[in-house]
């Protein structure tokens, strides 16, 4: 399919009318037939390794299928979405949990977070080490320009796998 070809070349085609395509930064690797016969991106955690796109300033709902490598220490800051210029709205506390409690944007960490469909408090729920679905409906507009790079700072890029990323500029309902 074209999406697999796009991943092979490091280019993700935005399927929305916005045409905000994403380009790989560094050397993330495509793992073919990794999950249910589908490809998965693998990120080493190297500084700046990510996929970047034009800044989206009105993010309201996001779905990820991802896992963090079990070797990542809980003391690492590795946000689920990033910002290459400013502190990411998605910044965690370096405690291994999905969201922070003070760092980042309260629209994210006080939003409606689900892990594999169950409502969780992302401030006290660890990032999954097996491919899992995380969804978030924020309390207001937040922004990002990458998966997942925090200002090109060492130890602040994703170290794990990403199978799916969907970003919406509207707060989707639970129905």
Put a short name on every predicted segment.
Residues 3-108, 142-144, 152-156, 170-175:
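Extracellular glycan-recognition modules
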Residues 59-61, 65, 97-98, 114, ...:
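Trp-centered recognition loops
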Residues 129, 156, 160:
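Structured loop/turn residues at beta-strand edges in well-structured enzyme cores
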